[in-house]
Amino acid sequence: MVVKIGIIRCGNIGTSPVLDLLLDERADRPNIDVCVVGSGAKMNPDEIERAVPTMLEMDRDFVIFISPNPGAPGPAKARELLSEADVPAMIIGDAPGLRVKDEIEEQGLGYIIVKADPMIGARREFLDPTEMASFNSDVIKVLAFTGAYRVVQNTIDAMIADVEAGKAPELPQVVIDTDVAVEAAGYENPYAKAKAMAAYEIATKVADIDVKGCFMVQDPDKYIPIVASAHEMLAAAAKLAVEAREIEKANDTVLRTPHGKEGETLSKTDLLAKPE
């Protein structure tokens, strides 16, 4: 059986660029068919009203909507449209989504909230395309090496397994905090685990500082250093996350969870061992 998955990508968070890739890392998984539609960097209601109906015209077993701030007007419109649709759907968002998770549940939708997927320092004096790309590369490292992406992988794979078993997919209600992420990372060395925990906690705080610099402080002489400091914090978090993985590599204890020939999740730690 081939499970048909729809992904609606509006705006960008650190999970957005790799979401579909987490499900099919070698582009050879036989049991899923993934289609992605989106609205680029923007997520205003007008863009949402074009992207979501486009996906709903397709025959999908379930749909995932991913964006920043699920409570913002655009994502709120997406939730409204998806809650009225005859297809199981879930929302993936960043920490502001915690404020509307009860609403998401009431709308009959699932959710994954990634607390350490932070807002970027979107001040024109500071953020250019190079800085934007650098920030997102740091987010990806943090979320990959702290285990957050593995939680996303496992959660969606469980939905796929439900559909394969002939059941309606169980819609998740997952908040990825430090404990949830690092547990999924499977670190064996306590120092590696501590570094991963530190990385996740720092990344979680980055959003608070960027919110201050982008919305609360109006003096450029003050808000420019504020958003720059948030990006420096994230770079430090990425460095810690890399150091955590390097410790595990030195001990040959890196946990890897590739997908098998039938789409099942395998596991291994020894580099030269076959996944089982």
UniProtKB/Swiss-Prot annotation:
It comes from the Archaea. GO terms for molecular function: ferredoxin hydrogenase activity; methylenetetrahydromethanopterin dehydrogenase activity. Pathway: One-carbon metabolism; methanogenesis from CO(2); 5,10-methylene-5,6,7,8-tetrahydromethanopterin from 5,10-methenyl-5,6,7,8-tetrahydromethanopterin (coenzyme F420 route): step 1/1. Keywords: Methanogenesis, One-carbon metabolism, Oxidoreductase. One of its GO terms (biological process) is one-carbon metabolic process. The keyword Protein biosynthesis does not apply. InterPro entries: MTD, MTD_sf. Its EC number is 1.5.98.1. Residues 257-276 are annotated as: Disordered. Residues 259-276 have a biased composition (Basic and acidic residues). It catalyses: 5,10-methylenetetrahydromethanopterin + oxidized coenzyme F420-(gamma-L-Glu)(n) + 2 H(+) = 5,10-methenyl-5,6,7,8-tetrahydromethanopterin + reduced coenzyme F420-(gamma-L-Glu)(n). Catalyzes the reversible reduction of methenyl-H(4)MPT(+) to methylene-H(4)MPT. Belongs to the MTD family. This is F420-dependent methylenetetrahydromethanopterin dehydrogenase. It comes from Methanothermobacter thermautotrophicus (strain ATCC 29096 / DSM 1053 / JCM 10044 / NBRC 100330 / Delta H) (Methanobacterium thermoautotrophicum). The lineage of its organism: Archaea, Methanobacteriati, Methanobacteriota, Methanomada group, Methanobacteria.
